[in-house]
């Protein structure tokens, strides 16, 4: 069985790990961080993968970060923003002691240059949406944003690393084009070497804040999970990021950490895994069929068999730590009701609904999810429905998603800032909808092409109120989306990392990024304790 196969593999991995041991003394004080996947661009106006954003968080700075209580902590800003009574003018005082990596002074003109560039050429329209109307320089170190409308999520937006400032001098020839292979920002590290598989970071001596606790970082990408796992086991790397490895190896590392053989760190659960259904073409244009497919998934079984429970079942699009995320409106596994809906649409009793399910072939958890779900459908609904699996490399999936190429596809999403807006808008916003079909907008780009009457108004309303009224609107949005059944949330993932005992346990910020500047080696005496 699938469970037996996974368990056997995990046992072999655990044995190999135990026999080889975790600790190899390092002769360098530099720290090596390993992950999978390549970085094709460093341009904040284009970067969207977790891997790339993690790097940006080390070489760039946001205007603000979030404290543990959710309040804003000024970073490049000098203090909290001032917002006008109508909510449409936002004034941001900036620090006066910041320089870019090329020595250029950071000021309001530089920040305005970067924001205007992002608004002009950025491919990540969901980050800002239609909120910012104009960017103005009010004083040498005072920036003013004119908004099209009041925005409750603006504070979260101002923490986005995608809006990190760039040196106007370094990007003078790239005001209207992307710069993929270099980055000149204000962060605690400067980039001294870049290719898709390796990046070398050196501490920035003129950094305005606390200096890094290490003399430099080497970020490397290895080709597969086994290579990454082996590199940590042999001591070739100091830190390993969890998104890079197979579930059985992740489980093995989790068990090793419990025994004290290495450090494990867990960040905030902000990444959602979900399935998108193509809603604008037959047969899945039939809402009852989409609802039946949603009812056929047993999340609890998937969580346990695929991830040993490390990925928690999720029945919402909004992570539970955010406003409106404390509910679970999506229905639980119910094959009996699924069969009723399938029969109403003419299936069962000799007629099967064939659903092509695409998984990203280079994402290990995707294939295990697909196989587990396929087995569930075969067990519960064999006479009514069958899943046909197809593995496609992730870059191809992302490129073809907005073309309507996939009837059903497994994806994941990490909001660019911790606010419900950063999860709902990228999946649901639509600039041109006809009934329940989105012709143009993020819902089309995300591959569902689904909308609903009243949904776009509700999305805007949710970003104009706070507290209980906002939660009520967010709940309405989720209810509409549940009924439409174009998205099926599957699980919630916390970022994890493992480090040698020679490195202090890694820490995460509230946005889910590893604090790379906090990585620090410990003395041999501390290591032995």
What residues fall within each predicted segment?
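Gly/Pro-rich hinge or "lid" segments in bacterial periplasmic/extracellular proteins
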Residues: 159-212, 216, 226, 336, ...
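Aromatic- and charge-enriched surface segment that lines or borders ligand/interaction sites
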Residues: 79-123, 138, 144-146, 231, ...
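Ligand/substrate-recognition segments at binding pockets and active sites
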Residues: 345-415, 495
């Amino acid at each position: 069985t699938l469970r037996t196969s996974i368990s056997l593999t995990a046992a072999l991995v655990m044995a190999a790990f135990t026999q080889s041991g975790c600790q190899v003394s390092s002769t360098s004080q530099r720290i090596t961080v390993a992950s999978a996947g390549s970085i094709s661009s460093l341009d904040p106006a284009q970067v969207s993968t977790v891997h790339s954003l993690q790097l940006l968080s080390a070489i760039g700075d946001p205007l603000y970060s979030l404290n543990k209580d959710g309040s804003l902590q000024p970073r490049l800003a000098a203090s909290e923003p001032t917002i006008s009574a109508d909510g449409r003018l936002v004034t941001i005082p900036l620090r006066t002691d910041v320089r870019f990596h090329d020595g250029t002074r950071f000021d309001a003109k530089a920040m305005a240059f970067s924001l205007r560039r992002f608004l002009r050429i950025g491919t990540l329209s969901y980050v800002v949406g239609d909120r910012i109307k104009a960017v103005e320089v009010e004083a040498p170190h005072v920036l003013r944003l004119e908004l099209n409308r009041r925005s409750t999520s603006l504070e979260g937006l101002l923490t986005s690393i995608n809006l990190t400032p760039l040196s106007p001098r370094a990007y003078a020839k790239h005001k209207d084009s992307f710069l993929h292979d270099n980055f000149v920002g204000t962060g605690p590290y400067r980039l001294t070497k870049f290719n898709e598989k390796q990046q070398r970071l050196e501490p920035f001596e003129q950094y305005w804040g606390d200096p890094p606790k290490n003399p430099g970082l080497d970020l490397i990408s290895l080709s597969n999970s086994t290579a990454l796992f082996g590199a940590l086991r042999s001591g070739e790397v100091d830190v390993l990021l969890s998104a890079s490895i197979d579930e059985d190896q992740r489980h093995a590392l989790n068990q090793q950490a419990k025994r004290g053989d290495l450090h494990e760190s867990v960040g905030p659960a902000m990444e959602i895994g979900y399935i998108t259904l193509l809603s604008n073409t037959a047969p899945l244009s039939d809402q009852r069929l989409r609802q039946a497919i949603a009812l056929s998934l047993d999340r609890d079984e998937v969580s346990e068999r695929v991830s040993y429970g490390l990925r928690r079942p999720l029945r919402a699009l909004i992570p539970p730590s955010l406003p409106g995320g404390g509910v679970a409106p999506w229905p639980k596994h119910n094959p009996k009701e699924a069969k009723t809906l399938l029969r109403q649409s003419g299936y069962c009793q000799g007629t099967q609904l064939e659903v092509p399910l695409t998984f990203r072939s280079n994402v290990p958890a995707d294939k295990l999810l697909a196989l587990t779900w396929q087995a569930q459908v075969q067990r519960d609904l064999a006479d009514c429905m069958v899943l046909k699996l197809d593995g496609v490399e992730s870059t191809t999936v992302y490129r073809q998603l907005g073309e309507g190429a996939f009837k059903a596809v497994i994806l994941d999403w990490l909001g660019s800032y911790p606010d419900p807006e950063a999860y709902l808008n990228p999946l649901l916003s639509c600039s041109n909808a006809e009934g329940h079909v989105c012709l143009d907008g993020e819902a089309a780009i995300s591959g569902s092409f689904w909308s609903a009457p009243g949904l776009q108004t509700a999305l805007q309303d949710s970003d104009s109120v706070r507290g209980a009224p906002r939660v009520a609107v967010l709940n309405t949005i989720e209810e509409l989306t549940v009924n439409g059944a174009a998205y099926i949330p599957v699980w919630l993932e916390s970022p994890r990392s493992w480090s040698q005992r020679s490195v202090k346990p890694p820490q995460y910020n509230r946005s889910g990024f590893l604090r790379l500047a906090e990585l620090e080696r410990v003395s041999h005496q501390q290591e032995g304790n």
